[in-house]
Amino acid sequence: MLKPLGDRVVIEAISKDEMTASGIVLPDSAKEKPQEGRVIAVGSGRVADNGERIALEVKDGDKVIFSKYAGTEVKVDNKEYLVLRESDILAIIG
């Protein structure tokens, strides 16, 4: 499993429906990049100027909305994940 460093977060993207309301199946090239995901792992937090570690606001299991083109895509054990900074997360859902 991935263990992110610092203020980084590992997210598993949640894909939207692959079919339109009218029943048309969308090919991969027509799908938008997902912007929702579930937090899989979080880093230990960022280090402030005074050396103090500041914990992250998100935690494992949180469902989040993140910036469309944020992060780096990685593949581990045939699963795709996104590693991004906490500042790229826009909101926690629920």
From Swiss-Prot:
Its main location: cytoplasm. Gene3D superfamilies: GroES chaperonin. CDD domains: cpn10 (cd00320). Keywords: Chaperone, Cytoplasm. NCBIfam families: PRK00364.1-2, PRK00364.1-6, PRK00364.2-2, PRK00364.2-3, PRK00364.2-4, PRK00364.2-5. It holds the Pfam family Cpn10. GO terms for cellular component: cytoplasm. GO terms for biological process: chaperone cofactor-dependent protein refolding. Belongs to the GroES chaperonin family. Heptamer of 7 subunits arranged in a ring. Interacts with the chaperonin GroEL. GO terms for molecular function: ATP binding; metal ion binding; protein folding chaperone; protein-folding chaperone binding; unfolded protein binding. The gene is groES. This is Co-chaperonin GroES. Together with the chaperonin GroEL, plays an essential role in assisting protein folding. The GroEL-GroES system forms a nano-cage that allows encapsulation of the non-native substrate proteins and provides a physical environment optimized to promote and accelerate protein folding. GroES binds to the apical surface of the GroEL ring, thereby capping the opening of the GroEL channel. It is found in: Cytoplasm.
